[in-house]
């Protein structure tokens, strides 16, 4: 599909689970997307955030908490926070 400027745009861009890399389908109503804010040295929000998407499968298995912790520890090392 094309917009008014002639650029090709997609109507639907599927998300992928951050923990398992599974595609999150439109019918997965148990999936969540979580934004985690970055803090400066004083503990104040600096306007940046990281987004994680978890599928309903991960949440149903009870692995959401450990997956989110693992993903954040990895990301925190990347951004040196």
From Swiss-Prot:
Alphabetical list of InterPro entries matching this protein: Ribosomal_eS21, Ribosomal_eS21_CS, Ribosomal_eS21_sf
**GO cellular component terms given for this protein:** cytosolic small ribosomal subunit
Q: Does the keyword Ribonucleoprotein apply?
A: yes
Q: Which PROSITE patterns match?
A: RIBOSOMAL_S21E (PS00996)
Task: Indicate what this protein is called per its UniProt record.
Answer: Small ribosomal subunit protein eS21
Q: Which GO terms describe its biological process?
A: endonucleolytic cleavage in ITS1 to separate SSU-rRNA from 5.8S rRNA and LSU-rRNA from tricistronic rRNA transcript (SSU-rRNA, 5.8S rRNA, LSU-rRNA); endonucleolytic cleavage to generate mature 3'-end of SSU-rRNA from (SSU-rRNA, 5.8S rRNA, LSU-rRNA); translation
Q: Which Gene3D superfamilies match?
A: 3.30.1230.20
List UniProt keywords, sorted A-Z. Ribonucleoprotein, Ribosomal protein
**What family, per the record?**
Belongs to the eukaryotic ribosomal protein eS21 family.
Annotated GO MF terms: structural constituent of ribosome
